[in-house]
């Protein structure tokens, strides 16, 4: 467990505050998890963003009438802190009985508070239910590898030694899997996700990638670090010209987290999958 997470509200009984309380936000430094991967703030080999979607966003108009909407928040992958998920939820719940003059005022408030917690500017977008409904759900790009026949006997820790490639062939492709699963390092609750790998480099053996992804099944770590570990393991193996790894996780407590890591510009289309 991350030392800072021990002091967060995650996994503990909490009072649900219904009036605006920005102090509920609990930042967790990324540095410790970066260090586990041999990284530091100055040596990150990727660009990226953590995209959070909130489906339980509500506040009051000056008249007292409630409003509901969907919130989208983009936290830079190189920000000093992540925001602990339960504290994020408690903070958003604190808006429920709080009046705001208009949507722009609420967006500005969210931007200020979340940027202060993350340590870097956070993007905020509040969207109507009709707007998001019209977008529907999308399919992930590329080839789905989930029907490949593999044998698995280890689920406790990621096993990069399972990964194989053909260095004699250079390919450019996108592959994806819906079988990503890990556990919250604080509560041990399952985190279900789908992951996409897009790259140009030595041809990756798809069955070995699937076996590797399944090896995360009982691993305990935050969403962001799982994606960073996958990125680094593939980068070491493939030595690619370009590499992007991103995951879309199933929501919990009205929030879903979607980490994106890439050697290229962080151009992330935030479209929901069928499980979201």
Curated annotation (Swiss-Prot):
SUPFAM superfamilies: Tetrahydrobiopterin biosynthesis enzymes-like. GO terms for biological process: queuosine biosynthetic process; tRNA modification. It catalyses: 7-aminomethyl-7-carbaguanine + 2 NADP(+) = 7-cyano-7-deazaguanine + 2 NADPH + 3 H(+). Gene3D superfamilies: 3.30.1130.10. Its EC number is 1.7.1.13. Keywords: Cytoplasm, NADP, Oxidoreductase, Queuosine biosynthesis. It is an enzyme of class 1 (oxidoreductase). It is found in: Cytoplasm. PANTHER family: NADPH-DEPENDENT 7-CYANO-7-DEAZAGUANINE REDUCTASE. This is NADPH-dependent 7-cyano-7-deazaguanine reductase.
